[in-house]
Every structure is written in structure tokens, then in C-alpha cells.
Amino acid sequence: KRQLVPYARLIGIECTRLGDELLFRLPASKDNIGNPILPALHGGVIAGFMELAAALHLLVFTGAPGLPKIIDFSLDYLRAGQFRDTYAKCQVWRQGRRVANVAITAWQSTPAEPIATARAHFKIEELARP
């Protein structure tokens, strides 16, 4: 699915399926550093990683023919993103016929210490009625 989104390829997003979940990984890359003194990941890279993780999660689990369209994205930065691999998991809170709400958590050391959390709302292809 990464080939469908050039930005995903640019920042290096990887995805692994773990049963009914997807684990997204953003490998440490010097190209993704925003503050070279710390060094710390650029906040926009973290946001883009989380938004794409949510969109790809929906793409996989809804079987939609195309990438869902973002309606709204709200992100809370909780800790600095260090220069190391970053991981994310998504949870669909609600999915209707036209809109889906997704929660995203990103971490580096352990899921118990997230570096950011986000909520995303997507317009999805209207699902056929039974």
C-alpha cells in the first residue's frame, strides 16, 4: 500500500500485520530530523506518519478501493521524538457509511510512554447498504 502514497515512501513508513492489528514503523532517518542539535524528529514528520498510519489502517480494514480523504486531524505532542525508530498503532472508534473516526498512538521506547496521540476523521467511500 505504501506505493500508493509517495509521502509514505519518502519518510520510509513500514507496516507489519500482527493478527487483527497493524504496527506502523517510521525508521530513524536523518532526513526526518527537525532539530539537529537534540536531535529530534520534525513535528510535521510525526504528524504525517500518524495521519498516514490511520489512512492506511482504514484502507486495509475497510477494503476501500482508494485512500480515505482526511476531514480533520488533531494531534497532541506529549514528548520529544528522539532520533530512533517510531511506532504507531491505530484504533477505529467509529465507522459509519461515509465517515470513520480513528485514534492513533505513536511511541518510541514503549507504548506506555507515547510521544504523541491523535484523532483523525476521514471521509470514506460510502459502503453499500445490505
Where are these regions (language model features)?
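Catalytic strand-loop segment that frames the active site of acyl-thioester-processing enzymes
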Residues: 11-40
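A generic structural signal for short beta-strands and their flanking turns/coil linkers
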Residues: 9-11, 20-22, 67-73, 84, ...
